[in-house]
Amino acid sequence: MLILPPKIEYVIETLQKNGYEAYAVGGCVRDMLTGKTPHDFDITTDALPEDIIRIFEKTVPTGIKHGTVTVISGGVPVETTTYRTEGKYTDHRRPESVSFVKNLREDLSRRDFTVNAMAYNSKDGLKDYFSGREDIEKKILRAVGDPQKRFYED
């Protein structure tokens, strides 16, 4: 079992109490699984940006077009992003468009590497649809999906 900081747990639990899914996601999960202390925590949720803003008292619409709202939890900024899929990357960095989805697996499938495509909350545990934990144990860096497409995007 992984232990999330109380301010991160608060954001996740608040979203859950309001009927939404929410997970710590990406590098923070990878770092915790490897015994490192994460420097920042990102949250992914099926709540839409306007729902996140409605639920939390202090927010900043940092990347609203891409579904990202920064929730200020006890003075700590926590990037909270709606589950999404992404359109084409014409500049190799940012997608031309994003579409919000209601499925965690679909959101995780857009991520670069399996070790970054894991999500965690204390209620549901680790969500690892692409064998990221196994890849960490084997010290393998593997792309999610088509490697050429992933490297073209990044």
Show which residues each predicted segment covers.
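Catalytic cores of the polymerase beta-like nucleotidyltransferase superfamily
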Residues: 1-153
